[in-house]
Amino acid sequence: LWYGLLGAASSLAAYFFAQYQAGWRLGLPLFGVGADADPVYIRATTMALAAIVFSQIGEVWNCRTETASVFSVGLFSNRQINIGIIFEICLIVFITLFPPFQDVFHTSPLSLTDYGFLCLLPPLILFVEEIRKAIVRKRHNQVNHSVTPQAEER
């Protein structure tokens, strides 16, 4: 549930980032809604798809431990995960860059600015989840270290 929320928020942020870059501002109608051929709409939905992929990178790093910091096991220590990350990045680049894939998946090329935005997502998700894990660890330690006098007598 938590990772789904983070992925959805990232996807929405990427969609609105693409709309904003095209000139959309709060209070104005979104570009291309209901018009599948609108290039702004296609780019915005491509960004939303790519954001899901990039969000999954942060999520897969985080889900390796339930409450311990991912840095305690090593961020890049799992070879299969590293290969999977490289594969999914290559796949999103292929379906956004090459016309045959663009036609099948209804995507458009992304700019370096777009990829810059997308590259911010994994560390952001990693940071948010590390904060959550630290809070869980702190609460767990407080519960385990609070000894009542009755518990000591047993």
Model-derived regions: residue spans:
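C-terminal transmembrane helices and immediately adjacent loops/tails
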Residues: 1-154
